[in-house]
């Protein structure tokens, strides 16, 4: 088991590093050239700038039972097909049951934006989101290590 982090605009990298170190879990952070990330714990992979370059590296390095951290619904969908556990930084899991609805909602919002319309904006991040994420990540690691 390892944790793969989609580092582009990931607000929970420090939490991931802390929890992974606590439970001795390998972390792979994938970023593009426009982001600078230093970690004395995680392996940092830099992808070329380009649409989906980070996503492709993550998917190609994901194995069954790995944990993938992302806000990207498309990447989440691909990681689920590799039988990974996929977490959103707000502390909830992407699942086979919710991914289709999330992708459909994303598509509808894109269509509204293309017509210069408005759509519901994502609420601002709260400290509760960090706590939810940290607790969920710990819970999943404990489950995976005990099975």
From Swiss-Prot:
Residue stretches in coiled coil: none
InterPro entries: UPF0178
Domain of life: Bacteria
Family of the protein in this entry: Belongs to the UPF0178 family.
UniProt cross-references to HAMAP family, sorted A to Z: UPF0178
The name this protein goes by in its record: UPF0178 protein Nther_1836
